[in-house]
Swiss-Prot record:
Keywords: Acetylation, Electron transport, Heme, Iron, Metal-binding, Mitochondrion, Respiratory chain, Transport. Electron carrier protein. The oxidized form of the cytochrome c heme group can accept an electron from the heme group of the cytochrome c1 subunit of cytochrome reductase. Cytochrome c then transfers this electron to the cytochrome oxidase complex, the final protein carrier in the mitochondrial electron-transport chain. InterPro entries: Cyt_c-like_dom (IPR009056), Cyt_c-like_dom_sf (IPR036909), Cyt_c_1A/1B (IPR002327). It is found in: Mitochondrion intermembrane space. Heme c binds at residues 15, 18-19, 81. GO terms for cellular component: mitochondrial intermembrane space. This is Cytochrome c. Belongs to the cytochrome c family. The keyword Transport applies. PANTHER family: CYTOCHROME C. Binds 1 heme c group covalently per subunit. It comes from Varanus varius.
Amino acid sequence: MGDVEKGKKIFVQKCSQCHTVEKGGKHKTGPNLHQLFGRKTGEAEGFSYTAANKNKGITWGEDTLFEYLENPKKYIPGTKMIFAGIKKKTERDDLIAYLKEATAK
């Protein structure tokens, strides 16, 4: 399991420009991530997804996020997420630990 505090720093540096995590948070360039775990791809209400995201059909969890965050465009070809990914395993673990906590509140 990753380090939540380190994950928060990673989120602020690499994700917060496009995403929010809190309940009722607004969509930015990317969708609000509240209640992400257990949700299927392309299902954040009120966000306009690509067909690739809608049709991927996986449920977000630790394993799927771990793979996606390494290389989003490889995992979901056609996604509009322009982020190149996080290559370091420990950084992905930390970010997922933070997201698991922050998106559940």
